[in-house]
């Protein structure tokens, strides 16, 4: 995938399945398409598994001497089941703790980033009567909205200053899954 740091950083290595196709469109011009599915977090109940699905198309043009390259791509990424889901029932207690799925959409503090809007996932009973058995002493947080970013990338590479090369790139990302009503 051609992607920007706005979607995920270079050091992220995704495990999963991906495929790529390329087509020669004209001398020095080719098109490409990429698609993949990557598990992000798996649970015993597969209906709660978190996945990243991605698809991208683009073109790459190189001048006849190879001094200039222009590359453009647009991608759609769907982070499935990543958004927080508020619990409706009281938390499990006694022998059900750790067996009954609860708070599986929690967004751990260790991976939170600036700019992520959060919602309280605790069951309403835990908010109104915090002494209810099984209720945590503090709030449990999840991501407030869905993530379905569209990523548009354009790059120009100049190689006529060999042995140096100058890269100029621009990326625009919009989260098409964001809905203010979710917050």
Residue ranges with predicted function:
Residues 67-183:
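Detector for outer-membrane/organellar transmembrane beta-barrel domains
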């Amino acid at each position: 995938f051609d992607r920007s740091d706005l979607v995920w950083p270079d050091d992220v290595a995704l495990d999963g399945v991906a495929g790529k196709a390329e087509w020669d469109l004209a001398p020095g011009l080719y098109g490409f398409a990429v698609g993949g599915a990557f598990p992000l977090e798996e649970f015993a109940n597969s209906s709660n598994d978190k996945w990243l699905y991605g698809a991208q198309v683009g073109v790459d043009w190189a001048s006849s001497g190879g001094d200039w390259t222009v590359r453009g791509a647009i991608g759609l990424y769907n982070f499935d089941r990543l958004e927080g889901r508020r619990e409706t029932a009281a938390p499990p207690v006694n022998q059900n703790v750790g067996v009954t799925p609860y708070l599986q959409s929690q967004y751990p503090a260790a991976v939170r980033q600036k700019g992520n809007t959060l919602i309280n996932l605790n069951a309403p009973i835990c908010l109104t009567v915090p002494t209810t058995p099984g209720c945590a002493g503090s709030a449990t947080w999840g991501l407030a909205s869905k993530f379905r970013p569209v990523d548009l990338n354009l790059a120009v590479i100049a190689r006529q200053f060999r042995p140096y090369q100058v890269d100029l790139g621009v990326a625009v990302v919009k989260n098409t899954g964001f809905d203010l009503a979710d917050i």
